[in-house]
């Protein structure tokens, strides 16, 4: 971890010092001096000022206030706070305009164009501790962080509070999930919507829309390394000021460190329309470039797996008559994947440790020893023979010490068997020592797993994770993660499953942080195989139409994308052809229509290809859209393969009908999309042969 931090600081210094446009500006001694930096297009502007020795920043867009003056600083255990009696020593400015290529993603090319302001700050009186605040202002938002140089009076430290504020100028409408539930460090909850002024404590990304609808604001963080995750402490009717709320150690300390030290970036994404929020690259641009010597082994793919059967009760994780992770059953899934062009198979419940209360017995898991009815080596050999990747499952139940003891040996074993993908899990609220699931202790662990996996050539899909903060740029083997309420809640969720609006909110909230392993593709909407009968409306079940399940492959991005249903539920289903065809890696993404909580229409062009895919989803209301196909190449002829809600389709009463049709289209064509209540539409637009 220290080595990575040193590399990061070196990269930051080289970027700042190596630019020809860097200048040094002396700041006078006036207490109210304002220092400003704007985005390259001039629309976003940060203003920094001292008020009675305290440091504040504010944010404007098009001359209108987004954030009012908001405090910066820290409180420590065993040392005075670093918040008052400050002076600005100097400022440094620089500009960057460069582009880089993602090995995979929602877009292939990313432009990094920003103006940077670096303020060196010190206490006016002894011990005169020093720090810097670095602002980078982009056309799509702002990032800022603290940097602590090595110094005599600030060596080892323990942060009890980060005082960073976000003082909203408008009582904007927010879409949020809570962060203050006792012993509940998880993100698998339904979203609520309310004015900022009534928020308590919430998770990020926090997406907001100003009351006049002119600005969308998203607060999050980037490059979370060796620090605690940031949640937001709400105003509770007092005002509209949100404060950083760091996840704690068991003793209440938030962050332990030693100078030199840098914090994560605090990010504020800005857009005129909700549709402009996606694809979100602000956090990616605030992470260091890829450090892997080669990414040739990293391969986005679709996969099937022994997963949904355990949620609906047709299989079990633990050994017994319905054990899902048997050699024979794994081979059955591998055969299905090979026959249908599916890249991978996930097997859960293969390793010793699932007997009894596996959540409490977190140290019982072995990540190398299989149950007697599962031959890991033979399954790996068979998968390789069939051209299918075997995805290994590592559930920890939060026993991270047990996992770290075995990790090198386990990953070396997987590598020796030609296995290059792991799905990990952390089904727990606190660590075995009582630390927060999202605190510095766990952030260090998650980074150690990413780095160790990279060493052994392993891609990662992390469930129960800390939230994504753009680290996939630096370590592109960190493919996808859960971090929100996914499909499994449709099997057993207490509220009857995810409501039809859920995915239309995720697109504009959770997915702004990074890819999500939502696990779409359930065709047995009423879960007859798990129950023995169609489930009733009040019971847990999938609350979409079948066509919407197809559309989710385009709408909810993940480079590892599951076809989650049982293989037998896909047999003799013409609609399964869309899952066979749809890519998981994109060159271009365009959001055509969207309203948070209501609907999304998105078009994506496949990486290294000429086909486009359109996904449209709606909430409980039926909708129609007239979509121009001007994004297609002019002068080319295409065929649109359309998977629409069938006649009479309705998520509650008639979810299964799918109407499949084809029509010739060009860049001058328009498509009329008609979505049933809770429905969707999925379209493949390929060049005409």
Language-model-detected regions and their locations in the chain:
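Bacterial N-terminal signal peptides that target proteins for export
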Residues: 2-16
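Carbohydrate-binding surface patches
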Residues: 596-638, 681-682
């Amino acid at each position: 971890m220290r080595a990575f931090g040193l590399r990061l600081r070196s990269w930051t210094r080289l970027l700042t010092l190596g630019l020809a446009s860097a200048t040094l500006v002396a700041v006078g001694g006036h207490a109210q001096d304002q220092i400003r930096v704007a985005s390259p297009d001039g629309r976003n502007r940060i203003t920094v000022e001292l008020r009675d020795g305290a440091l504040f920043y504010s944010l404007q867009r098009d001359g209108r206030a987004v954030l009012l003056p908001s405090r910066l600083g820290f409180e420590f255990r065993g040392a005075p706070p670093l918040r008052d009696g400050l002076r600005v020593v100097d400022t440094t400015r620089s500009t960057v305009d460069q582009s880089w290529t993602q090995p995979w993603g929602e877009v292939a090319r990313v432009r990094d164009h920003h103006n940077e302001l670096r303020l060196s700050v010190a206490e006016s009186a002894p011990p005169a501790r020093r720090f810097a605040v670095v602002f980078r202002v982009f056309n799509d938002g702002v990032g800022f962080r603290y940097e602590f140089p090595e110094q005599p009076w600030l060596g080892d430290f323990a942060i009890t509070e980060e005082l960073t504020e976000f003082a909203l100028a408008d009582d904007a409408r927010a879409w949020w999930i809570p962060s203050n539930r006792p012993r509940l460090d998880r993100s698998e909850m339904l979203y609520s919507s309310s004015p900022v002024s009534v928020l308590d404590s919430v998770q990020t990304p926090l997406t907001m829309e100003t009351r006049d609808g002119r600005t969308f604001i998203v607060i999050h963080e980037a490059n979370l390394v060796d620090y605690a995750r940031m949640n937001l402490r709400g105003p509770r009717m007092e005002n509209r000021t949100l404060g950083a709320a760091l996840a704690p150690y068991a003793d209440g300390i938030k962050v332990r460190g030693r100078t030199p030290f840098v914090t994560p970036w605090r990010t504020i994404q800005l857009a005129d329309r909700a549709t402009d929020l996606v694809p979100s690259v602000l956090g990616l641009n605030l992470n260091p470039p890829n450090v892997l010597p080669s990414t040739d082994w990293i391969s986005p793919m679709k996969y099937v797996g022994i997963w949904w059967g355990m949620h609906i009760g047709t299989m079990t994780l633990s050994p017994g008559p319905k054990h899902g992770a048997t050699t024979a059953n794994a081979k059955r899934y591998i055969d299905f994947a090979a026959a249908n062009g599916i890249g991978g198979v996930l097997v859960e419940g293969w390793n010793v440790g699932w007997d009894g209360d596996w959540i409490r017995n977190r140290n019982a898991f072995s990540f190398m020893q299989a149950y007697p009815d599962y031959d890991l080596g033979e399954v790996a050999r068979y998968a390789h023979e069939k051209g299918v990747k075997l995805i290994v499952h590592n559930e920890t139940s939060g026993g991270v010490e047990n996992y770290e003891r075995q990790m090198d040996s386990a990953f070396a074993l997987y590598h020796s068997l030609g296995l290059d993908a792991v799905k990990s899990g952390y089904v727990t609220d606190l660590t075995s020592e009582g630390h927060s699931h999202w605190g510095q202790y766990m952030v260090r662990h998650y980074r150690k797993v990413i780095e160790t996996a990279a060493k052994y050539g392993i891609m990662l899909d992390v469930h129960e994770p800390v939230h994504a903060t753009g680290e996939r740029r630096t370590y592109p083997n960190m493919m996808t993660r859960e971090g929100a309420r996914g499909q499994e809640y449709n099997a057993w969720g207490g509220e009857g499953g995810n409501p039809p609006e859920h995915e239309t909110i995720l697109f504009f909230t959770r997915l702004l942080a990074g890819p999500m392993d939502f696990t779409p593709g359930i065709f047995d909407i009423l879960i007859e195989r798990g129950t023995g009968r169609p489930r009733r409306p009040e019971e847990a079940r999938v609350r979409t139409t079948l066509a919407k399940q197809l559309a989710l492959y385009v709408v909810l991005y993940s480079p590892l994308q599951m076809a989650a249903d049982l293989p037998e539920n896909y047999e003799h289903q013409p609609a399964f052809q869309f899952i066979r065809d749809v890519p998981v890696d994109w060159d271009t993404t365009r959001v055509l229509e969207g309203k948070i909580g209501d609907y999304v229409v998105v078009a994506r062009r496949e990486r290294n290809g000429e086909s486009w895919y359109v996904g449209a989803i709606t909430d409980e209301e039926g909708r129609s859209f007239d979509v121009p196909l001007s994004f297609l190449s002019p002068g080319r002829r295409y065929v649109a393969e359309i998977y629409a809600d069938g006649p009479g389709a309705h998520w509650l009463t008639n979810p299964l009908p799918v109407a499949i049709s084809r029509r010739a289209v060009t860049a001058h064509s328009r498509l009329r999309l008609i979505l049933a209540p809770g429905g969707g539409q999925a379209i493949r637009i390929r060049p005409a042969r």
